[in-house]
Amino acid sequence: MNSININSLELKLRYSFKERSLLLQALTHRSLHTQHNERLEFLGDSILSFVIANQLYHRFPEINEGNMSRMRATLVRGDTLTEIAREFDIGAYLQLGQGELKTGGAQRESILADSIEAIIGAIFLDSDIQTVEKTILRWYHKRLEQINPTHHQKDPKTRLQEYMQSHQLPLPFYLLAQVCGEAHDQEFTIHCQVSGLEELVVGKGSNRRKAEQEAAEKTLKKLEFE
């Protein structure tokens, strides 16, 4: 990666590295068979969890541990990290092996999410905990302003399962009905079947988990109107 590309990414991250080799390592996937980002990812995961937990603790002094845990899970989950990675166009800067490049690894959600954690680890090693905390909070500013402890933090599948259990009904059944598209741009179709609804509910997403969550969300809405 040339210095112009590094400069453009640093502007997006709003952080300038003293040791740019750390940023390059954070962007290097293990498929390249060189010094890759997995150790930085491990470090960044722990730092992100601490920073968000600390912020929630001070923002919401009346909220119990369970609700804070659910809010933190929402903020640090893979979907959120992938969104942040796409805001920074991280895929354009990733260093990948040929196999990953050919299969669209630069846009694979798990790789994008992992790279954000690795960048957090790299910033910490390049600076200190106060600096990386400020950087994370800049990235998360809107999300922290918008998160509401009174809203459902549990995912739709969990809420649907709890709904069925509270009504003493069998648990939902999820069937993978179809997978279409290229490896880097697949669409999964899930059918959800529950007692109380005659028809199957269809959910779609870029991976099986997302498709199941969409199906669960639609099922909950249907059950509420039955």
Curated annotation (Swiss-Prot):
Source organism per UniProt: Hamiltonella defensa subsp. Acyrthosiphon pisum (strain 5AT)
Molecular functions (GO terms): double-stranded RNA binding; metal ion binding; ribonuclease III activity; rRNA binding
Active site (UniProt): D45, E117
Alphabetized Pfam families for the sequence: dsrm, Ribonucleas_3_3
Keywords: Cytoplasm, Endonuclease, Hydrolase, Magnesium, Metal-binding, mRNA processing, Nuclease, RNA-binding, rRNA processing, rRNA-binding, tRNA processing
Principal location: cytoplasm
PROSITE patterns recorded: DS_RBD, RNASE_3_1, RNASE_3_2
Entries under SUPFAM superfamilies matching the protein: dsRNA-binding domain-like, RNase III domain-like
Residue ranges constituting the RNase III domain according to the UniProt record: 6-128
Ranges where the DRBM domain occurs: 155-225
CDD domains in the cross-refs: DSRM_RNAse_III_family, RIBOc
Enzyme Commission numbers on file: 3.1.26.3
Keyword Repeat: no
Chain coiled-coil ranges: none
Name of the molecule in the record: Ribonuclease 3
Residues where Mg(2+) binds: E41, D114, E117
Record localization: Cytoplasm
Alphabetical list of PANTHER family matching this protein: RIBONUCLEASE 3, RIBONUCLEASE III
UniProt entry tagged with the keyword Lyase: no
GO cellular component, one term: cytoplasm
Subunit structure: Homodimer.
Function: Digests double-stranded RNA. Involved in the processing of primary rRNA transcript to yield the immediate precursors to the large and small rRNAs (23S and 16S). Processes some mRNAs, and tRNAs when they are encoded in the rRNA operon. Processes pre-crRNA and tracrRNA of type II CRISPR loci if present in the organism.
